[in-house]
Amino acid sequence: YNTNNSVNTRLFAANGGINRVFFSVGFPLTKFLSFGLTTNYNFGKFEYESFNLYEGVNYGIYSNSSSDISGFNYQFSSNIDIPIKKDLNFNIMLSYSPSSILNSVNTQDLYTSTTNLINLNSLGDLVEVNLEERGLKSTELRVPKKYIYGVGLGNHNKWYIGAQIEKKFSSNFENRFLNIKNID
């Protein structure tokens, strides 16, 4: 077993998320059937950090990658409200969100550091990675299509019990910038 250049310290961190502003409209088609549409504007930022410090090497490598995300997606829904008794209704809900594209503007910086704590005393060289050259400065994230099915039973404005199932087709999700595949 060769211990030369084996990883002594390896750290990973991530933070961020997507915010959403939405507009929804719904209207009745019949006495028991209604239809709705939601338009979402998604925006946010993700940051990913990693640090590798190797035995026998003076400087470790610190990577800071970030993605600014923005884009629209849509959801179409229908609701069937069937009266069973005077104060008892049965509901069926169907919802469909087609696949959509979110735009990602990416940056990546690499640092060398003598410790796993990044501060002015430990920093070595700084390199801003040329993502434009690799075709990764602007990438697209495909939001998978999804279906939501729900049923419920209740007394209007008093009580309600229901169940919902969501089917999301996320097996083809891919983030080329971070080389992350098949995220659910």
Residue ranges and their predicted role:
Residues Y1-D184:
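Outer-membrane beta-barrel porins/channels
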